[in-house]
């Protein structure tokens, strides 16, 4: 049985989210208002919809790759997270990454895409050390940001 996603259209004049092509992972989200973003400017843009993400799943708001490549429009907290318990309007925190040109977004423009994925919800267990918890050392250990190298400037 396929998973369904309940969608409330808060703005009846905007289309329901939809996939551009059969098999696409994400559904397009539309801007519910006109917005002009100056270079480097951010705006929280409403989409005119609310969704009920099923328990055990998460909604992830991703940039549209064409907009990112063509005009530098992206999402500040990419991907944005829509938790299963959230029932309010989906809003997208957009940013203009172009250093010189403003970006004009018109009501009804496709601005982002929503992916719904299963998510593990592990029980958190406090331990005093990973050794005590019986978890083996790894080759990475506590090597964090930049620890794997791989860039000429590092």
Curated annotation (Swiss-Prot):
Residues 144-154 have a biased composition (Gly residues). Pfam families: dUTPase (PF00692). The keyword Hydrolase applies. Keywords: Hydrolase, Magnesium, Metal-binding, Nucleotide metabolism. Residues 135-154 are annotated as: Disordered. InterPro entries: dUTPase, dUTPase-like, dUTPase-like_sf, dUTPase_trimeric. GO terms for molecular function: dUTP diphosphatase activity; magnesium ion binding. SUPFAM superfamilies: dUTPase-like. It comes from the Bacteria. GO terms for biological process: dUMP biosynthetic process; dUTP catabolic process. It is an enzyme of class 3 (hydrolase). Pathway: Pyrimidine metabolism; dUMP biosynthesis; dUMP from dCTP (dUTP route): step 2/2. Belongs to the dUTPase family. NCBIfam families: dut, PRK00601.1. HAMAP family: dUTPase_bact. Each trimer binds three substrate molecules. The ligands are bound between subunits, and for each substrate molecule, residues from adjacent subunits contribute to the binding interactions. This is Deoxyuridine 5'-triphosphate nucleotidohydrolase. It comes from Mycolicibacterium vanbaalenii (strain DSM 7251 / JCM 13017 / BCRC 16820 / KCTC 9966 / NRRL B-24157 / PYR-1). The gene is dut.
């Amino acid at each position: 049985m396929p998973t369904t996603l309940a969608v409330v259209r808060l703005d009846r004049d905007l289309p329901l989210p939809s996939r551009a092509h059969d098999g696409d992972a994400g559904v397009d989200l539309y801007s519910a208002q006109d917005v002009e973003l100056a270079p480097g400017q951010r705006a929280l843009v409403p989409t005119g919809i609310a969704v009920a993400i099923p328990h055990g799943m998460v909604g992830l708001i991703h940039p549209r790759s064409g907009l990112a490549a063509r005009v530098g429009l992206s999402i500040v907290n990419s991907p944005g997270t829509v938790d299963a318990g959230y029932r309010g309007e989906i809003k997208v925190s957009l940013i203009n990454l172009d250093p010189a040109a403003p970006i004009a977004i018109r009501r009804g423009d496709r601005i982002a895409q929503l992916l719904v994925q299963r998510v593990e919800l592990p029980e958190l267990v406090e331990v005093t050390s990973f050794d005590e918890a019986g978890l083996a050392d790894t080759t990475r250990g506590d090597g964090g940001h930049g620890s794997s190298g791989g860039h000429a400037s590092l």
